[in-house]
C-alpha cells in the first residue's frame, strides 16, 4: 500500500482551508470548542484514553462536569492499568492492585483531540491521558510514553511524520452470536479471498462507503480502502500526520470501525491471526523524519544509490538493533506470534530491503516526498501509541549512537536471509528478552518497561493455564 508521506507548505495551507488535518485534529480554538459543547443538545461529552493493550476506555460525562474539569483534571480508577483485556486484575504488577486499593488516577483532557462523533449525532469527543499525583506524565500511560519519545526527537531537531495501515476481518455476526457459536463456524461478510476486489466492495457498498465517509467526518481521513486477501477482509491506509495525531487516529480507527460495523450488523476483528489457513492481519507503521519546519525530508538523499540519507540508515540500523529487545511492543499478545510465520506476508527475520515485502523493515525511497520506512513486523492487534513510540525510540537510538547500517539490503526472499538472526517466536521468549534488555529500558524508560513486561508475563501465564480445542481434539478420546 503506497502512503504518500508529506505535503508541500502550499498543500498544507490548502488542506487547512478545506478542514482536512495534516497534523492537528481540528481547526477550532478553545473558545469555539467550549461553545460547541455548550450548544450541543445532548448535554454530554464522551472522553476516553487507552489502556496498555490499546483498548479505548472511556465514559460519558455531563457538560457541567466537563466544564468543571476541562482546565484541571478528571479521574479514572487506575485499574485501567491494573487489569488485562478481559478485565481480569493482574496479580503481579507493581503500579496498582489490591495492595494499593485501586485509587482514582488523575487524567487530563486534551482539547486538541476534539472531534464530533458522526454516528452519535455529532456528540463531542476528547482523548485524554493519565498523569500522576504530582501532575507529571504517568509512567504507564501509552500516550504519555509517545509524547516523551517525541520530545526526544524534537530536542534533536526532528519532526516525525507517521501513519499506520490496518488489515482486519469482518463477519456477518454480532457480539452475541460469536459467543453463542463459541467463535466457530462464523459467517464472513463475503466469501472467498478476493484481494483488491471491486466486486466484493460493491456487494457491501453501504458498509464500505460508511467506513470511508464516517471516518473522514470523525477526522480519521483514509488514503485508501480496499478488500484484502481473505474472506471479508479489508485494508485501510490512514493519512499520515505528525506522530501524536497519527497515533490518535490509529487508536480511534480500530474502535470506530467496530462501531460502524455494528451499525451494519457485522463485527470487525483486529486479531493478528484468525485462522492458521488464512493470512494474518498487519498494522504496518510508516515513518519519516523531517526538519523542524516540515519542509525537508531528512530520510531522502538523491545522490545515494538507494536514495537514502545517512540519517535514514542510522535510523534503520537502530531499529534492527533494538527490534529483538522490544518485540512485544509490536507483537503484544499470544496470537501475534501465529502471524509471524514464514511465507504469510509477515516477517520472521531481522532484515531490511528496498520495496521488499518479505523483510522486517521495508524502505520506500523513490521520491523526496514519499521517502519513508515501513515497519512490517507490527500486527493489527497492536497498541498504536506503543508501536509508534517503539519505532521512533529505536530509530533515534540508531541516530544518537551513529549505528552503521552494515547489513546489506535483502534481495528477493527475506525469509531465507538469516544473516542477522530471526525474531523471537513466542510472547514468552520476546518478553524475557525485553525484561533483560538494557536498551529497552534506556529508550522507553525503566518504569514503563517494568510495568509492560509484567503485563506480558501475566498474558503468557493465562495462556499456559488454558485448555484449548486442539488439546480436546488430540487427547480427549485416544490418550
Where are the regions that the model predicts?
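Short non-domain terminal segments
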Residues: 1-2, 8, 181, 450
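Glycine-rich, acidic/polar active-site loops that bind/position phosphate-bearing ligands
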Residues: 28-479
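Cationic, low-complexity basic patches in intrinsically disordered or flexible, solvent-exposed regions
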Residues: 25
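Short, low-complexity, charge-dense intrinsically disordered segments
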Residues: 2-22
Amino acid at each position: 500500500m503506497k502512503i504518500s508521506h508529506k505535503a508541500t507548505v502550499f498543500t498544507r495551507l490548502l488542506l487547512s482551508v478545506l478542514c482536512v488535518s495534516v497534523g492537528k485534529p481540528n481547526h477550532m480554538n478553545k473558545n469555539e470548542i467550549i461553545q460547541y459543547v455548550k450548544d450541543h443538545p445532548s448535554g454530554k461529552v464522551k472522553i476516553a484514553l487507552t489502556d496498555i493493550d490499546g483498548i479505548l476506555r472511556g465514559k460519558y460525562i455531563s457538560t457541567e462536569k466537563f466544564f468543571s474539569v476541562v482546565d484541571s483534571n478528571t479521574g479514572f480508577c487506575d485499574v485501567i492499568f491494573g487489569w488485562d483485556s478481559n478485565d481480569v486484575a493482574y496479580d503481579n504488577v507493581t503500579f496498582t492492585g489490591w495492595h494499593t486499593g485501586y485509587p482514582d488516577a488523575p487524567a487530563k483532557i486534551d482539547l486538541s483531540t476534539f472531534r464530533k462523533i458522526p454516528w452519535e449525532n455529532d456528540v463531542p469527543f476528547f482523548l485524554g491521558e493519565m498523569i500522576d499525583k504530582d501532575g507529571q506524565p504517568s509512567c504507564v500511560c501509552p500516550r504519555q510514553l509517545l509524547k516523551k519519545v517525541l520530545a526526544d526527537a524534537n530536542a534533536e531537531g526532528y519532526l516525525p511524520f507517521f501513519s499506520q495501515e490496518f488489515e482486519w476481518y469482518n463477519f456477518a455476526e454480532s457480539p452475541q452470536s460469536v459467543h453463542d457459536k463459541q467463535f466457530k463456524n462464523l459467517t464472513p461478510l463475503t466469501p472467498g479471498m478476493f484481494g483488491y476486489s471491486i466486486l466484493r466492495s460493491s456487494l457491501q457498498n453501504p458498509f464500505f462507503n460508511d467506513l470511508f465517509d464516517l471516518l473522514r467526518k470523525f477526522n480519521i481521513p483514509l488514503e485508501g480502502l480496499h478488500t484484502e486477501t481473505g474472506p471479508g477482509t479489508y485494508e485501510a491506509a490512514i493519512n499520515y500526520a505528525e506522530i501524536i495525531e497519527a497515533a490518535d487516529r490509529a487508536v480511534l480507527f480500530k474502535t470506530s470501525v467496530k462501531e460502524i460495523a455494528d451499525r451494519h450488523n457485522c463485527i470487525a476483528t483486529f486479531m493478528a491471526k484468525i485462522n492458521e489457513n488464512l493470512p494474518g492481519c498487519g498494522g504496518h507503521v510508516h515513518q519519516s523524519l523531517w526538519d523542524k519546519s516540515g519542509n525537508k525530508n531528512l530520510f531522502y538523499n538523491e545522490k545515494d544509490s538507494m536514495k537514502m540519507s545517512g540519517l535514514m540508515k542510522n535510523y534503520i540500523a537502530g531499529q534492527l538493533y533494538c527490534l529483538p529487545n522490544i518485540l512485544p511492543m509490536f507483537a503484544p499478545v499470544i496470537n501475534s506470534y501465529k502471524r509471524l510465520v514464514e511465507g504469510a506476508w509477515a516477517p520472521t527475520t531481522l532484515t531490511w530491503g528496498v520495496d521488499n515485502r518479505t523483510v522486517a523493515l521495508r524502505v520506500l525511497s523513490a521520491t523526496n516526498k514519499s521517502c519513508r520506512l515501513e515497519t512490517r513486523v507490527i500486527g493489527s492487534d497492536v497498541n498504536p501509541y506503543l508501536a509508534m513510540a517503539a519505532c521512533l525510540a529505536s530509530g533515534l537510538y540508531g541516530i544518537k549512537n551513529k549505528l552503521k547500517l552494515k547489513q546489506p539490503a535483502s534481495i528477493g526472499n527475506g525469509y531465507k536471509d538469516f544473516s542477522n538472526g530471526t525474531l523471537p517466536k513466542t510472547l514468552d521468549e520476546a518478553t524475557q528478552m525485553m525484561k533483560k534488555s538494557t536498551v529497552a529500558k534506556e529508550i522507553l524508560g525503566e518504569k514503563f518497561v517494568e510495568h509492560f513486561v509484567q503485563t506480558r508475563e501475566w498474558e503468557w501465564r493465562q495462556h499456559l493455564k488454558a485448555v484449548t480445542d486442539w488439546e480436546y481434539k488430540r487427547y480427549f478420546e485416544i490418550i
